[in-house]
Each structure stands twice: as structure tokens, then as C-alpha cells.
């Protein structure tokens, strides 16, 4: 990103408009055929620093460029404490960068108000947290419908359909204490999709699941991806990497392969091809009684 913008460019950015110079920056990074609005979500030159109690600030994200296309599954890997959760929080508009730009589709959200960011997050982003919470007094279908932006009737129908997709069609009226750990995680993932987000952010989505259920969840992510949703998952699970279209590495706040075209396409194809070759039957189905 250019460090010396004209006054007009600065005013355009403050108003949430991408300037020609900014678009040119994107087009010359990683993929010359892509402009801002070709991405579902993007970061440009993002820095995130945290105070360290009087010493030098901790740099969690160091001049990060990242983008995901609609219908792309990106896995983010790296050591613990390397900034992966911070990356998800900044992408998901849960935390603000110290500097840099953020875009959702063709909208520059860098200078939006708190209320505008909250609305954009609710309308465009779904979250699958590692430590999710279901309200104990609500049924599965009520938990899924809770964050909806739709009218209540449509929300209930959509919530029921999502739970059926996740193999929980016979658990609609069960409360969380009547569900296994894996079933509760599937309820949480279904809830993340209730508003038909353009972007799905997942923190260790298979971390608490057995291999079969994890594969079933990832197969559902592929179905979501086929519907045009960009899926971005922080993970330590090699299985998630096998399903991803692209794997990027974040170490000490430095992101490698963050833009389409920066990773090795042959390595990506080999990784996914090896997974597909190892299958002798269709992916596992999520049964209602599986944990």
C-alpha cells in the first residue's frame, strides 16, 4: 500500500470508497487480474499491535496482505501464539487493526462506524468459534435461529433445514444438555450459516471432533464453499489442510501466501488430490446419533 496518498485519496478512503490508486495496489499484488471487488474479504497492509505494559508493543500482525475469493477454502496454519486468532478477529470486524485497510466484497470497511461494522458483520460474516456457547434453555433450532437477520418464521424454517443438513433433523427440539459434544458443535456451525454469510470464519472447526465427524463437517464446508461462501479456517489439523484450496502460514505476525496466486498451485493440487484419491466411497454422512 502506498505510504504517501494525496489528500483526495485520503478523503475517498475516509468515505469508504476505493481509489484508483488503491485498486491498482491490489491489481499488482499476487494476481494482476483481480481488483478489490473480486474478493469476498481482504486485508491490505494490516498491522496490529498490542501494548505490552510499558515495553515495546507486541506486533501480532505485521504488514499483512490477505484475500479470499468467493467459493474459496483457505486454511491458516502456524505455531500457537503466532497471530492466527488476531487475524480472524480483524477479518471478522471483531477487532480493529492499528493500520491498514479491510474490505468486505467491494466495500471498504476501514472507516465505518461501530454501528456500521456491527451491521456489516451480522449481514456478511459467520463465525465458528472453538469455544462456542449455546443457550441452555433454548432448543437446537432456537439456538440456530437466534442471530438471524430474517423474519422469525423464515428463520425457524432455515434453521431446521440447516440442522437437517448437519444430520440433526431429529434433534430440532433437543436442548443442549440432550446433545453430545459433536452434536453441539454442529449446532454452532449451523448457527454460523443462518444469515447466509459471504464469509465463514472458523477457529479450529474440527478440534473437538472425532475423525469421521470432522470429515463430515469439512464436507459440509465444501458444500457451503460451492454456494459461493469464502471459508477461512485457523487450524492445527492436517485434515483441514487437505480440504483447503490454499494453505497460508502465519508465523510471528508475518503471513506467507496470503493472496491468491502466491501459494504453489501444484502443492495445493497435490494436497487435495491425495485426499480425494484416498477415498473409496462418498464422504461420511452425519447421522443424528453420532457424537
Model-derived features: positions:
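Short coil-to-helix segment of the ABC ATPase nucleotide-binding domain corresponding to the Q-loop/switch region
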Residues: 138-145
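Conserved ABC ATPase "signature" region
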Residues: 107-108, 154-170
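ABC ATPase C-loop
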Residues: 168, 172, 192-193
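Conserved signature/switch motifs of ABC ATPase nucleotide-binding domains
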Residues: 174-177, 194-195, 227
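Catalytic Walker B motif of ABC-type/P-loop ATPase nucleotide-binding domains
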Residues: 200-203
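ABC ATPase NBD coupling module
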Residues: 109-125, 226
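Conserved ABC transporter NBD signature motif
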Residues: 100-108
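Conserved ABC ATPase signature
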Residues: 175-185
Amino acid at each position: 500500500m502506498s505510504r504517501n496518498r494525496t489528500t483526495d485519496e485520503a478523503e475517498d478512503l475516509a468515505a469508504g470508497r476505493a481509489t484508483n490508486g488503491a485498486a491498482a495496489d491490489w491489481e499488482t499484488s499476487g494476481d494482476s487480474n483481480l481488483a478489490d471487488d473480486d474478493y469476498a474479504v481482504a486485508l491490505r497492509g494490516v498491522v496490529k499491535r498490542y501494548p505490552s505494559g510499558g515495553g515495546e508493543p507486541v506486533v501480532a500482525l505485521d504488514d499483512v496482505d490477505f484475500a479470499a475469493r468467493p467459493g474459496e477454502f483457505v486454511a491458516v496454519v502456524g505455531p500457537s501464539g503466532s497471530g492466527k486468532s488476531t487475524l480472524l478477529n480483524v477479518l471478522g470486524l471483531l477487532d480493529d487493526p492499528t493500520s491498514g485497510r479491510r474490505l468486505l466484497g467491494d466495500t471498504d470497511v476501514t472507516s465505518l462506524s461501530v454501528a456500521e461494522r456491527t451491521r456489516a458483520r451480522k449481514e456478511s460474516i459467520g463465525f465458528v468459534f472453538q469455544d462456542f456457547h449455546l443457550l441452555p434453555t433454548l432448543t437446537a433450532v432456537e439456538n440456530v435461529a437466534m442471530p438471524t437477520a430474517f423474519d422469525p418464521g423464515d428463520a425457524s424454517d432455515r434453521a431446521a433445514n440447516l440442522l437437517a443438513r448437519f444430520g440433526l433433523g431429529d434433534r430440532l427440539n433437543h436442548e443442549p444438555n440432550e446433545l453430545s459434544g459433536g452434536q453441539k458443535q454442529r449446532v454452532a456451525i449451523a448457527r454460523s450459516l443462518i444469515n447466509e454469510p459471504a464469509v465463514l470464519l472458523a477457529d479450529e472447526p474440527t478440534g473437538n471432533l472425532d475423525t469421521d465427524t470432522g470429515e463430515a463437517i469439512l464436507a459440509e464446508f465444501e458444500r457451503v464453499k460451492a454456494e459461493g461462501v469464502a471459508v477461512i479456517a485457523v487450524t492445527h489439523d492436517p485434515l483441514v489442510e487437505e480440504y483447503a484450496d490454499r494453505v497460508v502460514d502465519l508465523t510471528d505476525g508475518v503471513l506467507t501466501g496470503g493472496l491468491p496466486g502466491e501459494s504453489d498451485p501444484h502443492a495445493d493440487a497435490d494436497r487435495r488430490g491425495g485426499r480425494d484419491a484416498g477415498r473409496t466411497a462418498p464422504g461420511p454422512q452425519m447421522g443424528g446419533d453420532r457424537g
